Curated annotation (Swiss-Prot):
Assigned keywords, A-Z: Cytoplasm
Location(s), subcellular: Cytoplasm
Source organism per UniProt: Schizosaccharomyces pombe (strain 972 / ATCC 24843)
Main location: cytoplasm
Protein name, UniProt field: Transgelin
Amino acid sequence: MTSQLEKEAREWIEETLHTKLNAQLDLLDQLQSGVILCRICKEALGANIRYKESNMPFVQMENISAFINYAQQVVHVPSQDMFQTSDLFERRNDEQVLRSIHSFSRYAAKMFPGKVRGLGPKLAEKKPRVFSAQQQREFREGVNSLQYGSFDMPTQGTEKIAFSRRRDPTGNMY
């Protein structure tokens, strides 16, 4: 499963940046500096995101953190869909990183249509059902409790169910 996610993520990144990534290296090793992720935001989505190419660990973690902040605050990717900096930098949870890239692509495609394509299923849109007072009244009048029963939740008292005999604290049984 992870190899399929990685393949799709690699293709999406290459398509988005119009650049080929090194096929000999692992995708997550190439993303570890955070530069490629920030370039996606800056070049493809036009973000004003600052990043620096460096081999210093704290700079790389800042780049990753900048991507995560942009994804959550601007693209509105839910926090449960995003990875944490240590998941990528320390390679703690590779699958979560790949799933986050997929999720980021979907939310970015929704927010910036035509700039990037989304990976995986299309995001659903809320379509709340609004009923008029007349429709609600017709529904209430049309329900026959003899046919459908009661809409109240059953309880032990209403269903006359006893899971044990009643006990007296002195030990007597009823």
